[in-house]
């Protein structure tokens, strides 16, 4: 997908880039597959900020995506390719022969008019088809991978994302995840063949602060620019270092310090993710 640049009518617009929208074929979304999603803007149920530097952003409607892909044995045809304001990849509207319509993530190379299907086994290894991991050949690239059978895809769903099937061990299948982590997943879990499209999304330059605000991202203030009451790095006469290792506003080391808690699923990790 082509990267679009702009005429530098302002300093911020000089370096701003965006993706060409020529691949989008729909002028309007299906109303039955839209819903209003209340936005928390980083607040919890008490109204207190639990995730800093977040806001609501531009008003938008949520597209209901079929992550489960559980219409087994029913062929679907890609009707449209659409923009989704909640995602960095495109979505496809699939019309099934039984009259049902669902949105799915658009895999790279899947176009309008293509046929897709879900089944436990026996399908061609074709982009967009969904099968159980135990029935997909070793070396295949997959996305929208379940971690628990029937719970819907949770892994490799962002633009350009994929995991690779590395082998089988009993009831488990070993995967190399986008982070570089090697992990066992139950062979009964579903996965979709191919990689997620819109892989050039990571090359976009935001270009100006207002565009980040539309995305729901608020400015970040350096701790060294605060007062001592607000941050451990704050205070001092003029610009000064904090005299300690970098920490969060609550005093936790913030560069390279491991904070992951132990959990039962740790035994399924073969090798940890790469930094």
Swiss-Prot record:
PROSITE patterns: RIBOSOMAL_L2. InterPro entries: NA-bd_OB-fold, Rib_uL2_dom2, Ribosomal_uL2, Ribosomal_uL2_bac/org-type, Ribosomal_uL2_C, Ribosomal_uL2_CS, Ribosomal_uL2_dom3, Ribosomal_uL2_RNA-bd_dom. The keyword Cell cycle does not apply. One of its GO terms (cellular component) is large ribosomal subunit. It comes from the Bacteria. Residues 257-275 have a biased composition (Basic residues). GO terms for molecular function: rRNA binding; structural constituent of ribosome; transferase activity. Residues 218-275 are annotated as: Disordered. One of its GO terms (biological process) is cytoplasmic translation. Coiled coil: none annotated. Keywords: Ribonucleoprotein, Ribosomal protein, RNA-binding, rRNA-binding. Pfam families: Ribosomal_L2, Ribosomal_L2_C. PANTHER family: LARGE RIBOSOMAL SUBUNIT PROTEIN UL2M (PTHR13691:SF5), RIBOSOMAL PROTEIN L2 (PTHR13691). One of the primary rRNA binding proteins. Required for association of the 30S and 50S subunits to form the 70S ribosome, for tRNA binding and peptide bond formation. It has been suggested to have peptidyltransferase activity; this is somewhat controversial. Makes several contacts with the 16S rRNA in the 70S ribosome. Part of the 50S ribosomal subunit. Forms a bridge to the 30S subunit in the 70S ribosome. Belongs to the universal ribosomal protein uL2 family. This is Large ribosomal subunit protein uL2.
